From Swiss-Prot:
NCBIfam families: PRK05416.1
Protein name: Nucleotide-binding protein XF_1405
GO MF annotation list: ATP binding; GTP binding
Family: Belongs to the RapZ-like family.
UniProt-listed InterPro entries: P-loop_NTPase, RapZ-like, RapZ-like_N, RapZ_C
Alphabetically ordered keywords of this record: ATP-binding, GTP-binding, Nucleotide-binding
Free-text function comment from the UniProt entry: Displays ATPase and GTPase activities.
Residues binding ATP, per UniProt: G13, L14, S15, G16, S17, G18, K19, S20
HAMAP family with a match to the protein in the record: RapZ_like
Binding site for GTP: D65, I66, R67, S68
Source species: Xylella fastidiosa (strain 9a5c)
Keyword Plastid tagged: no
SUPFAM superfamilies found in the cross-reference section: P-loop containing nucleoside triphosphate hydrolases
């Protein structure tokens, strides 16, 4: 029997650059996540984790940064020995401009992890850049988040990293509000505004398409049943063709007025259907809910 193949994403970088958002995104994609793990505990952590699920593929994401101790220089060395555990390890380094980091700290009023050294914020940022420079140099990818908001960063992580460490076709089902614009990166866009709107039901207005009451409402609507059936037939046919054409990933977007009920429901239902059909690399992204 072929041994299970495991994937490890190491998220590092500068404080305030979006590492926590990235780690949470991987968690939402069913990665087993741990933040602020001391570097010296990494081998033990992985051995324990792999022992728990010995016969299944494991997808693990860990956050390691300046808070993780003084042994950051050992991280890249350990990454290259990960194949001993049949692990594909990927090191991602997140950063942002000094101006962006200063603004983010001003907005959140959080303390920098190195502030206990008696440094000003610009000095702490400069020192952190110096201490993490070896990790940046060794990283598989360096992500500058200066121009990203939270939604853009989450989507970038999903499309560029979380779904691309596989030779299989990766599927992203996205919901959005037309009033905020159509996602320019979508391969297929479906307009759900023609469907009955749960927003006009007072007891459903505050809920989303993820909630069971909204699902029950949608599944009682004949037009919704027909809409889903026809889109399912279309995608079942053409996604298989796209995989045969060696596409890496496909984004399918559903839009409605507010991006809260109909589009979310449809994206969730299509993602569930895709998993049931055997697609292993499937994710959802709800732009207006993030």
């Amino acid at each position: 029997m072929k041994p299970p193949e495991h994937s490890l994403i190491i998220i590092s970088g500068l404080s305030g650059s979006g590492k926590s958002v990235a780690l949470k995104t991987f968690e939402d994609l069913d990665y087993y996540c741990s933040d602020n793990l001391p570097v010296e505990l990494l081998p033990h952590f992985l051995r324990c984790r792999l022992r728990v699920a010995e016969l299944s593929d494991q997808r693990i994401a860990i956050g390691i940064d300046i808070r993780s101790g003084s042994n950051l220089s050992e991280l890249d060395q350990w990454r290259h020995t990960a194949k001993h555990y049949n692990i594909k390890a990927h090191l991602l380094f997140f950063e942002a401009s000094n101006e962006t980091l200063l603004k983010r700290y001003a907005d959140t009023r959080r303390r920098h992890p190195l502030s206990h050294l008696g440094l000003s914020l610009p000095e702490a940022i400069a020192l952190e850049r110096e201490l993490t420079a070896p990790l940046r140099e060794a990283a598989e990818a360096v992500i500058d988040t200066s121009t990203f908001n939270v939604h853009q960063l989450r989507r970038h992580v999903v499309t560029e990293f979380a779904l691309t460490h596989s030779d299989k076709l990766s599927l992203l089902f996205e919901s959005f509000a037309y009033k905020r614009g159509v996602p320019t990166e979508a391969d297929f866009v479906f307009d759900a505004r023609i469907l009955p709107n749960p927003h006009w039901e007072p007891e459903l207005r505050s809920l989303t398409g993820r909630d069971s009451n909204v699902r029950d409402y949608m599944e009682q609507q004949p037009d919704v049943i027909l809409y889903l059936r026809q889109i399912t037939e279309f995608l079942d046919t053409w996604l298989a063709r796209l995989q045969a054409d060696t596409r890496s990933y496909v984004t399918v977007a559903f839009g409605c007025t507010g991006g809260k009920h109909r589009s979310v429901y449809l994206a969730e239902q299509m993602a569930r259907h895709a998993r049931e059909k055997g697609w292993s690399e499937v994710a959802t992204f709800h732009r207006e809910l993030e």
